[in-house]
């Protein structure tokens, strides 16, 4: 049987371009051959200002890019603050929120992913972080809505003595993004 062709988008996390202005970061993203950008909050701040959101979205479109995700966003027990992030993402057309959620945020996040039909992708960090191991992420998402999953930062997993191929295998079905880096 012939292999099924797959299309996936390859983007850059804007944090990698944090020393550049928004316009320069978008231009560099396009010049590097990427078709998507994952914004981080300092480059595309969380706001309910529709004019500001439209301006950024137009700049993204002008470069022929799309937004793959937004993060890494902190989520806590503050349901009002969490809702602001989701409302912003909905207005901006962002379907995945890369996140570092506290344990007490998950009940609210579960409600929000259902209400907004968005995904939350837990981003792991290196040794000592609450999500340094793939099992930490799997425990956090266990018995949660399928829209709560992972964004596997493979560089951080390597620092935490995890094997990237095994991480990807274990997160199958709940892996909504991958960050690649070389420290």
Report each predicted region and the residues it spans.
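Conserved beta-strand positions
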Residues: 12, 39, 99, 122, ...
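Active-site acidic/histidine proton-transfer and metal-coordination neighborhood
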Residues: 24, 66-150, 158-161, 170
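Short, glycine/acidic-enriched loop or turn micro-motifs at the edges of active sites
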Residues: 41, 126-127, 156, 182
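N-terminal pre-domain/capping segments
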Residues: 1-96, 114, 129, 173
């Amino acid at each position: 049987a012939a292999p099924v062709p797959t299309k996936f988008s390859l983007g850059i996390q804007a944090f990698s371009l944090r020393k550049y202005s928004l316009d320069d970061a978008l231009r560099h993203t396009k010049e590097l051959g990427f078709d998507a950008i994952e914004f981080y909050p300092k480059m595309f701040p969380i706001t309910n200002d529709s004019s500001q959101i439209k301006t950024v979205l137009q700049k993204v479109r002008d470069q022929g890019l799309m937004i793959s995700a937004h993060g890494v966003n902190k989520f806590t027990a503050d349901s009002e603050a969490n809702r602001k992030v989701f409302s912003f993402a909905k207005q901006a057309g962002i379907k995945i929120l890369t996140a570092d959620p506290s344990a007490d945020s998950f009940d609210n996040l579960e409600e929000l992913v259902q209400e907004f039909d968005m995904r939350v992708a837990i981003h792991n960090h290196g040794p000592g972080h609450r999500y340094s191991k793939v099992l930490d992420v799997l425990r956090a998402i266990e018995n949660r809505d399928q829209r709560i999953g992972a964004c596997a930062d493979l560089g951080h997993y390597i620092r935490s003595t995890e094997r990237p191929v095994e991480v990807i295998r274990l997160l199958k079905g709940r892996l909504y993004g991958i960050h690649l880096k070389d420290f």
